[in-house]
Amino acid sequence: METAILTGAGLAAPAGLNAYIPLLVLALADRATDRVTLHGPYDAISSNVGIVLLVLLLSIEIAVDKVPGVDHINDIIQSFVRPAAGVIVALASTSGVVSISPAIMVLTGLVLAGSVNAVKVTSRPAFTFGTGGILNPFVSMAEDGIAVVTSLIAIFVPFLVIL
């Protein structure tokens, strides 16, 4: 039970940086490992269609997030998507654990992804203004890297999430 909660929380936080990386990591972990088992309706995430859709959305997100100015518009739009993705990964990670209230996981996913997203959305314009947008692609790549690493930690070493 604790592992599922930590995995859910650990996936929700990076969803605030990039909605699709934690979802894709969760889907691939369900398909390729025994670390996560998604139960209905969340098993749709790891279906062939789900994975293809996540790869497509991730590709768009990665490309758009590297362009100064466009990245800010994307961040505003994604301010609704990222917290929702945080909720989905938190719920999906704990869907097989009966003793966890879904309401707690909804709140966990919303707060963690929403908080991380709020920091991203408010700090990005400062990078754009301060550097004329030159650093935006590098900041975006760093965010993507952090999202990948923290998502993998949440799946494979969930107790590190509390650090």
Question: What is each residue range found by the language model?
Answer:
Residues A84-S93, P102-S123, G145:
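Mid-bilayer segments of alpha-helical transmembrane spans in multi-pass integral membrane proteins
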Residues A15-A19, Y42-L54, Q78-P83:
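Helical membrane-embedded segments and adjacent short helical loop/helix-boundary regions
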